[in-house]
Amino acid sequence: MIPVRCFSCGKVISNYWDEYKRRVSDGENAAAVLDDLGITRYCCRRMLLSHVELVDVLSPYQ
């Protein structure tokens, strides 16, 4: 699950995750997608760039 807010500045970033993931999986450049979405702060950019979905990996162990 993507965090709702950026850990550093507190900006809401979770509403960008679905579109970011879809467009990057379609082959667009991640930096261009972030620029297009208006995410300019490097702290917010790293939240989306470095996020890894672990829910599906960890769910069998509960």
Curated annotation (Swiss-Prot):
PANTHER family assigned: DNA-DIRECTED RNA POLYMERASES I, II, AND III SUBUNIT RPABC5, DNA-DIRECTED RNA POLYMERASES I, II, AND III SUBUNIT RPABC5 FAMILY MEMBER
Annotated compartments: Cytoplasm
InterPro entries membership: RNA_pol_su_RPB10 (IPR023580), RNA_pol_suN_Zn-BS (IPR020789), RPABC5/Rpb10 (IPR000268)
GO cellular component entries: cytoplasm; DNA-directed RNA polymerase complex
Lineage: Archaea, Methanobacteriati, Methanobacteriota, Stenosarchaea group, Methanomicrobia
Cofactor note text: Binds 1 zinc ion.
Keywords recorded for this protein, A-Z: Cytoplasm, DNA-directed RNA polymerase, Metal-binding, Nucleotidyltransferase, Transcription, Transferase, Zinc
EC nos: 2.7.7.6
Its job: DNA-dependent RNA polymerase (RNAP) catalyzes the transcription of DNA into RNA using the four ribonucleoside triphosphates as substrates.
A molecular-function term among this protein's GO annotations: zinc ion binding
Catalytic activity: RNA(n) + a ribonucleoside 5'-triphosphate = RNA(n+1) + diphosphate
Superkingdom, natural source: Archaea
Protein name from the UniProt record: DNA-directed RNA polymerase subunit Rpo10
Gene Ontology biological-process entries: DNA-templated transcription
Recorded name of the encoding gene: rpo10
